[in-house]
Amino acid sequence: MRFQATLLASTIYLRFCDVKSEFFILNISEALAISLDATVQSVAATIAGLRYFAMAMTGSSKQEGVLQLTPTDNVLVALKDLRKGEHLTFSGAAYTLATDVPAKHKFATVPLAPGNDVIMYGVLVGKAMRPILQGEVLTPLNLHHQAAPFHEKTMEYSWTPPDVSRWRNTTFRGYHRADGQVGTRNYWLVVPLVFCENRNIAVLRQAFEEELGFAAPQIYRQQVAEFVRLYQAGRSNEIAGHGAVAADARPPAPRVFENVDGIKFLNHEGGCGGTREDSDNLCALIAGYIHHPNVAGATVLSLGCQHSQVAILLEQIKKRDAKFSKPLLVFEQQHSGSELAMMSEAIRKTFVRLMEMNENCRRAPAPLSKLCVGLKCGGSDGFSGISANPAIGHVSDIVAALGGRTILSEFPELCGVEQELIDRSTRREVGDRFIQLMRDYAARAKAVRSGFDMNPSPGNIRDGLVTDAMKSAGAAKKGGTSPVTAVLDYPEYSTEPGLNLQCTPGNDVECVTAQVGAGANVVLFTTGLGTPTGNPVAPVVKISTNSALARRMADIVDFDTGPIIDGEVTIEQMGEAILEKVIAVANGQVRTKAEALGQNDFIPWKRGVSL
């Protein structure tokens, strides 16, 4: 069936209510002309997906209640723990809860028969497995994953960018590289081409970090030393009742090189024994890290006989920068005689390059168009798609409007919102590549008796994300509303300004590793449950979806978007505040919690089997 539709007064809104009253918070009307082939239901779903909701909450929203994301939804989100038998009045309808509904979870607003669609964010997120009562909580026992089908781009997407006049002349002080990229940090990289060199990497780390003032505080080492002291003093009975370790009050050791932010040592389990594709991809990923603007140069250790050959690495570096000019030190153990000789030479040459790096690299002003921001969520909860994700989506829109790049990844967590992203593509071939990569990924998962439907973790489900489509609909909010300008396969490098889609897993560290390998010089990472994830090369800003998490895990959370849920600020206001945080981090004025903890996570994505 073909529909020629002009939608006037397209309404996207949020509604809040408590047991006594109803609060209509925002009603945005705008004209939108569309032309597409679809059923009535898919038209509604596509339109709802094209326009993300915005929040402009008043003091009334601080009252505990429920939330509706779009008017077509047949579920409500609990903002607090609701009890069986409670009576709610919402949008002129009365509800009596048939079950307890924990905060962040959803309940049905209408009775659902087996096979009926469940709609949230205006898109299909699942189907009823059995009869679901009005007011009954949705769980894996009554709802299973179902996502809408998708097809090639059939409509032009019109985007109104946010007003970015206040940032048009804003700069950050970064490290300018010869290829035109600008780094937010200035690191020397030490990396193995194969897992056989991991021990040698660890030896180099021990040799360099402490002496150069880059070692993380050793508070747990101090705790063990205290226990040894008590034991040797005959006071071992005091150990059982010893309190938690205190933060290290001693000042950090002074850095030898003022203009070097650190030496980063990578470890991995790849480079040989798997498919040639995995070895080639590892070389491409490492090439992306060496090419990265936060890296001034690198020391590479190779065994010599592995699949991941030095020649492949050099070829991948040239693909990213034909005029590559950074210092690159390569050592092959099988061609170096003794280990002692190779390691001593590696230390000497690396130290010389660090001296040069310290003399030649200085921060200088750069426009915000030089930012490349990774957009990631992990340890997600039922508030992720309501607070933190749309807030960094607004950051993405601002950066895109300023000519910068953003990267939205985690393809298993874009399941169910594909059509919206396809229709936002700037060119037909961009959308077609996304379709092909999504279908190939889904087929690979099915080939090993898995699927995107198995993506939600036990923690996701406990906190309200019952199906992958439900999780995906909220995860996609990180991409804002700007056009999709490029689609990258792993481990390709990002060059196109605007929103880039990148094929990666949802796995936190594999995804961030890939985003940084694609050029992200800052990563925004939202979490509702809490995760310590960081990266060796790019600062990772951890953003909580709720204030309880920010208070409970203050040692790993950098920014709290809980005030959105509390009705204190809008998504746009929060996004602007996050952007200011990004600028401070990019300037080097602020270290992220992951940086302070030395959370240098690096896991290459291994697509193939071990052989």
Predicted regions and their residues:
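Secretory-pathway ectodomains
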Residues: 28-31, 122
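Short acidic/histidine-rich active-site segments
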Residues: 526-531
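Extreme N-terminal basic, low-complexity initiation segments
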Residues: 2-8
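Metallocofactor- and cofactor-centric catalytic cores in central/energy metabolism, strongly enriched
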Residues: 56-376, 380-484, 496-513, 519-522, ...
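Short, Lys/Arg-enriched N-terminal segments with co-localized hydrophobic residues
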Residues: 45-55
